[in-house]
């Protein structure tokens, strides 16, 4: 039974806008993950802070309306399996997302409202954000689009403060359904008592590391050495190479996500099901967030493993904060964040709000800072995303030179790794996170990847071990010790 129904009609918010239907139902008996499994969610967005506990909202995309993809310089509209080129005056997919978002207005609620889609930008999308030259012939064994966003007719938003469920229905000029009927069908499914979909939760699965065409450990150590030489030569202040791990497993990605979110609760947790492949993550690192005209970047650089005892944990924290190399690396990335925001923020508004504090997660701890600025009047979240992509924490400084060195050294395209995942709202607000501590499932192969910042005094063996530390939580969710 619906507790409350609101239909936001075009004449209320502007004649050109489409209506949004919101219905509210009790949610005390349910969990977001259980609902995601029961209802076959295509997208799950959740958050858990080490300081504040669980964030207020979890979001599920239940019924896909269409998707928008970018491959090379072409943008495609895909609906019901049929694909057509987007013929519009756009620079890239980000302009297209904004076009769809602006078919709606903000519903006046605090919860996330992704009318502009939910999806990812690959690392290689950076070539469309600045003058960056990447090797067009570089292998891409994952065969992924440069960017892909899902748009929904029906979302479920779970309010953890009130235990209420908001069912949100959206139509677009290019895709329309009976929203009242769609929301009623979801409400009936929520309350039908059939939870058989949860029967496979916790089932055992085997996992094994697969060989690659090159030795990932030795290649990574060689790349650390090569990146260090770029620093010595004065070409870079820092570079961030990465390495890949392939794991064979029949474990469904949604089950791996369940295990990861339980063992490694993080501020940014997501599961995205694109059909042929799934992407999931539990990680602390924001890319850029824009809300109410304020843009924020939170550089995370400097890592130590967690201690086995409280005393060891405190000792490792003190060691991390006293590490000259780690602090220098972190300062460079704070300066890079200030520079990125300075491109699209009002003069004099960019400032470091918090600096050099420690955040702890299940397997590692990090040094974190927060940089904020007020957007210029003619800028939106899309401009902030373009100006800051990719993050300095996964590329280096100077950013363009570091990206081109990464492209030369790494044997395959990164694709999902160190890109971003996020969603866009009608007013230009957005929330994006960096796709690290993440995994992609395609067929029976799970793909993990990690890297680290390289400066003058980096040690290849220590840097290699750090990549294992960063992948360990995800690997353990697959039942694999690395």
Curated annotation (Swiss-Prot):
The record, for Pfam families, names: Anth_synt_I_N, Chorismate_bind
Could you confirm whether the keyword rRNA processing appears in this record? no
Which pathway does it operate in?
A: Amino-acid biosynthesis; L-tryptophan biosynthesis; L-tryptophan from chorismate: step 1/5
State the needed cofactors, names only: Mg(2+)
Q: Give the InterPro entries listed for this entry.
A: ADC_synthase, Anth_synth_I-like, Anth_synth_I_N, Anth_synth_I_PabB, Chorismate_C
GO BP, sorted A to Z:
L-tryptophan biosynthetic process
Keywords for the protein's UniProt record, in alphabetical order: Amino-acid biosynthesis, Aromatic amino acid biosynthesis, Lyase, Magnesium, Metal-binding, Tryptophan biosynthesis
**Sites where the protein binds L-tryptophan:** 47, 267-269
Gene Ontology MF term list: anthranilate synthase activity; metal ion binding
Q: Which family does it belong to?
A: Belongs to the anthranilate synthase component I family.
Subunit structure, briefly?
Heterotetramer consisting of two non-identical subunits: a beta subunit (TrpG) and a large alpha subunit (TrpE).
Record-linked PANTHER family: AMINOBENZOATE/ANTHRANILATE SYNTHASE, ISOCHORISMATE SYNTHASE MENF
**Protein name per its UniProtKB record:** Anthranilate synthase component 1
Which gene name belongs to this protein?
trpE
């Amino acid at each position: 039974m619906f507790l409350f129904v609101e239909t936001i009609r075009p004449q209320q918010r502007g004649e050109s806008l489409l209506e949004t239907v919101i219905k509210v139902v009790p949610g005390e008996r349910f969990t977001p993950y259980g609902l995601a499994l029961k209802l076959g969610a295509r997208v799950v967005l959740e958050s858990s802070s080490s300081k504040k506990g669980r964030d207020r909202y979890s979001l599920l995309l239940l019924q896909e309306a269409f998707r928008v993809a970018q491959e090379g310089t072409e943008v495609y509209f895909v609906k019901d399996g049929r694909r057509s080129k987007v013929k519009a005056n756009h620079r890239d997919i980000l302009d297209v997302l904004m076009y769809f978002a602006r078919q709606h207005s903000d519903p006046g609620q605090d919860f996330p409202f992704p009318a502009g889609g939910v999806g990812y930008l690959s690392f290689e999308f950076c070539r469309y954000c600045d003058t960056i030259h990447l090797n067009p012939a570089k292998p891409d064994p994952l065969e992924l689009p440069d960017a892909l966003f899902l748009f929904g007719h029906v979302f479920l938003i779970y309010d953890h403060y009130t235990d209420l469920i908001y069912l949100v229905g959206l139509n677009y000029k290019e895709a329309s359904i009976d929203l009242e009927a769609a929301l009623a069908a979801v409400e009936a499914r929520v309350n039908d008592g059939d939870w058989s979909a949860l029967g496979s939760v916790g089932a055992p699965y085997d996992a094994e590391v697969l060989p690659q065409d090159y030795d990932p450990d030795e290649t990574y150590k060689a790349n650390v050495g090569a990146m260090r030489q770029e620093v010595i030569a004065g070409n870079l202040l820092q570079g961030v190479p990465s390495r890949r791990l392939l794991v064979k497993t029949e474990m469904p990605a949604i089950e791996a996500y369940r295990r990861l979110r339980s063992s490694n609760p993080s501020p940014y947790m997501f599961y995205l099901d694109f059909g042929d492949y799934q992407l999931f993550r539990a990680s602390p690192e924001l890319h850029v967030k824009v809300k109410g005209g304020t843009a924020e970047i939170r550089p995370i650089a400097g890592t130590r493993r967690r201690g086995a005892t409280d005393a060891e944990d405190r000792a490792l924290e003190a060691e991390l904060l006293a590490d000259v190399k780690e602090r220098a690396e972190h300062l460079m990335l704070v300066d890079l964040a200030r520079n990125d925001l300075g491109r699209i923020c009002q003069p004099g508004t960019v400032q470091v709000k918090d600096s050099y504090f420690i955040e702890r997660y299940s397997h590692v701890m990090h040094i974190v800072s927060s940089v904020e600025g007020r957007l210029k009047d003619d800028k939106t979240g899309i401009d902030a995303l373009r100006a800051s992509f990719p993050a300095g924490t996964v590329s280096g400084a100077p950013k363009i030179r570091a990206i081109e060195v990464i492209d030369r050294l790494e044997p395959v395209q990164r694709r999902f790794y160190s890109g971003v995942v996020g969603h866009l709202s009608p007013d230009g607000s957005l929330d994006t996170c960096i796709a690290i501590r993440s995994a992609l499932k395609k067929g029976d192969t799970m793909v993990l990847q990690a890297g680290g910042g390289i400066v003058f005094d980096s040690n290849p063996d220590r840097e290699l071990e750090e990549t294992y530390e960063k992948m360990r939580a995800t690997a353990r969710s697959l039942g694999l010790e690395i």
